[in-house]
Amino acid sequence: MFTGIIEELGSVVDVREGGLTVRAAKVLEDAAQGDSICINGVCLTLTAMSGSTFTVDTVPETRRRTNLGDLRPGDPVNLERALRPSDRMGGHFVQGHVEGTGRVKSVTEDGPALLIGFSAGPELMRYIVAKGFIAIDGASLTVVDRDDAGFSVTIIPLTQELSLIHI
């Protein structure tokens, strides 16, 4: 279980059919093999660690339902360690079991923030509620508005700075 509060941006070092190797610092401070780690909103098991890198396995279903199959070496990724019972709950409960992906359809400056519109199919839209929460690439966000074809969220400057959600 995660909170959707991104702890750091990692960098993809290697991509193979069955997994990824990522460079990170903070999320490895107290990590151990077998721990759950959230990469771009996906709960994965840390299978190996070496210095400042860690490896996770990805199965075909994960690569089909998420953006992990599109990653290449050098790409940034949002990272978060699993929630502990004593942690602050700053976002919302994020299981890391991704239902699917949407597509950016519009980006509008809204003061210092960005209003981003997404399109998503009916299989996802039935779960999305205006003023409810959603995790996009693992970041906990509030749904501004929705209709049958999509939804919008606002990205505050701090989220733009600390995550890979910036345009």
Feature-to-residue mapping (PLM):
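Conserved loop->alpha-helix
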Residues: 1-165
